[in-house]
């Protein structure tokens, strides 16, 4: 898996949690009653978040 900096990781998880909170479908099976942030963390750990990081060359 690609190594992200702590800043990239925070931005990816935060952005995905916001998407989930606004009604985006969760891409993995999650237990009922889970928060959007927890769902985003689970997605990040499984590597299924559809967000790409582009670094300058």
Swiss-Prot record:
GO terms for cellular component: chromosome; cytoplasm; DNA-directed RNA polymerase complex. It is an enzyme of class 2 (transferase). Its EC number is 2.7.7.6. PROSITE patterns: RNA_POL_K_14KD. InterPro entries: DNA-dir_RNA_polK_14-18kDa_CS (IPR020708), Pol_omega/Rpo6/RPB6 (IPR006110), RPB6/omega-like_sf (IPR036161), Rpo6/Rpb6 (IPR006111). Keywords: Chromosome, Cytoplasm, DNA-directed RNA polymerase, Nucleotidyltransferase, Transcription, Transferase. The keyword Nucleotidyltransferase applies. One of its GO terms (molecular function) is DNA-directed RNA polymerase activity. It holds the Pfam family RNA_pol_Rpb6. The keyword DNA repair does not apply. Its main location: cytoplasm. It is found in: Cytoplasm; Chromosome. Coiled coil: none annotated. One of its GO terms (biological process) is DNA-templated transcription. It catalyses: RNA(n) + a ribonucleoside 5'-triphosphate = RNA(n+1) + diphosphate. Part of the RNA polymerase complex. Belongs to the archaeal Rpo6/eukaryotic RPB6 RNA polymerase subunit family. PANTHER family: DNA-DIRECTED RNA POLYMERASE SUBUNIT K, DNA-DIRECTED RNA POLYMERASES I, II, AND III SUBUNIT RPABC2. DNA-dependent RNA polymerase (RNAP) catalyzes the transcription of DNA into RNA using the four ribonucleoside triphosphates as substrates. This is DNA-directed RNA polymerase subunit Rpo6. It comes from Thermococcus kodakarensis (strain ATCC BAA-918 / JCM 12380 / KOD1).
């Amino acid at each position: 898996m690609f190594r992200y900096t702590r800043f990239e990781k925070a931005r990816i998880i935060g952005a995905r949690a916001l998407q989930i909170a606004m009604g985006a479908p969760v891409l993995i099976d999650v237990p009922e009653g889970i928060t959007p942030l927890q769902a985003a963390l689970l997605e990040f750990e499984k590597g299924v978040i559809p967000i790409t990081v582009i670094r300058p060359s």
